[in-house]
Amino acid sequence: MTAKRKPTALLILDGWGYREGKDSNAIANANTPFWDQISSQNPHVLIHTSGMAVGLPEGQMGNSEVGHMNLGAGRIVYQNFTRITKDIEDGVFAQNPAISSAIDKAVSNGKAVHLLGLLSPGGVHSHEDHILAACKVARERGADKVFVHAFLDGRDTPPRSAQPSLERTDKLLKELGCGRVASIIGRYYAMDRDNRWDRVQAAYDLLTLGEAPYHAESAVQALTAAYERGEDDEFVKATLIKGSSDNDAVISDGDAVIFMNFRADRARELTRCFVEQDFDGFQRNKLPKLADFVMLTEYSANIHTACAYPATELTNSIGEYMATLHKTQLRIAETEKYAHVTFFFSGGKEALFEGEERILIPSPDVATYDLKPEMSAPEVTDKLVEAIKSGKFDLIVCNYANGDMVGHSGVYDAAMKAAECIDQCLKRIAEALNEVGGQCLITADHGNAEQMVDENGQPHTQHTTGPVPLIYIGPKNISLKEDGRLCDIAPSLLDLMELEKPREMTGESLIVQN
């Protein structure tokens, strides 16, 4: 009979951050006796989950995708935002093969370069600095017609905050002497992701036909008129900005188009309108024969067009490494975070590794999770305890969604109830691990529920930039190093399992043997 395995578990408490202050801190103020016990009696430190520590620009809050990628990879995974910003700073962006080639083709045709994208400092789907850098590159490579088609934000930025971005862009293009902001439209239309093709068509027809319900002399005038109509940035209707003629800046045969969003999900639909011959979302009245259409990053493996920043492959994540060592592993979460403990934790790979099993627990069917703050945590725990006691798994990775998903609701009392539910679940898990001689690390991918009200007294619904806890439960006599990062967790797990880390993992183990 095969000997039962003593599991090492990683428990990821999504959105469970640390903050000194107790005001509006749903975690600190909740009744969590087990958490209080392990926080004071077990090895316990704080680790970093935002900014450069996870491959994001300094000061940028972390998120679940980035967090799980770093947790599983065992190295800092530089995000597209950071890769592109770094290339611009280092002068490498100007030589990017896809971007420079597209611009050169348009210039040799005597045609225009069109830059599409979310013109915003939000940093979630795009950054206006990238768009401005592309304007400069186009001019340096000889383009004398550079048109920015500005999609307006208002979701990752305040609802009416687009004016400085439009002014900054028009000012630069005027200085370069090569173009203007040629159209504006809210992201509600240009960046749909739910196959609402009527919205996307409004953007496509604006770009390719110059069809728009509104025209204006300048981008700022267009925005002012939209505000007067009661439209916030996100919902600004298609507006064409006049030049030498109404249609001098529509996308035409021989032009180059560069889509400057780095996040894929809301860039796919509009991209498909331009590049798919068998597109069937709506009837295209014009399909320009472009010199090139460039995606800033790969929006989908199924979209076949030039890409400036292809995905970098992550090899030897902890999941892949476990498989090469013929170890067994389990990934478990409820629906809301299932992709995070599977696809993202595996370095962007969907397929199961050899020896890997997965358990998906459905998330509750409620409008918002403050209505059921425990979500499916008790059911996740039932399956997790069963897996621990089964003796089947060397490594178990589990996500609890409550701190993040209930935190996003902005409802303080519900977030406290979520924390109290997690506390009860952790006690059950610790008892099961103790019973079989197992061990675990408890941490989070980023904070959220530790701050439920912002400095203006409004509900605080987004992630935080503060640290998160790291706690060890198990039989080993160890301490934990301070100042760790998410990328140090995989090496720490391997250390606890008495396994060497692969050379690809540049994170450091935080385990100190006493």
Swiss-Prot record:
Pathway(s) of this molecule: Carbohydrate degradation; glycolysis; pyruvate from D-glyceraldehyde 3-phosphate: step 3/5
GO biological process: glucose catabolic process; glycolytic process
GO CC entries: cytosol
Catalytic residues identified in the record: 64
Cofactor annotation: Mn(2+)
Gene3D superfamilies membership: Alkaline Phosphatase, subunit A (3.40.720.10), BPG-independent phosphoglycerate mutase, domain B (3.40.1450.10)
Cofactor note: Binds 2 manganese ions per subunit.
Catalytic activity reported: (2R)-2-phosphoglycerate = (2R)-3-phosphoglycerate
An example Gene Ontology molecular-function term: phosphoglycerate mutase activity
Keyword Cell division: no
Residues holding Mn(2+) 2: 14, 64, 445-446
Binding site for substrate: 125, 155-156, 187, 193, 263-266, 337
This protein's UniProt keywords: Glycolysis, Isomerase, Manganese, Metal-binding
Keyword Isomerase among record annotations: yes
InterPro entries (alphabetical): Alkaline_phosphatase_core_sf, BPG-indep_PGM_N, Metalloenzyme, PGAM_B_sf, Pgm_bpd_ind
Annotated NCBIfam families: pgm_bpd_ind
Protein family: Belongs to the BPG-independent phosphoglycerate mutase family.
PANTHER family for this protein: 2,3-BISPHOSPHOGLYCERATE-INDEPENDENT PHOSPHOGLYCERATE MUTASE
Reported function: Catalyzes the interconversion of 2-phosphoglycerate and 3-phosphoglycerate.
Protein name (database record): 2,3-bisphosphoglycerate-independent phosphoglycerate mutase
Lineage: Bacteria, Pseudomonadati, Pseudomonadota, Gammaproteobacteria, Oceanospirillales
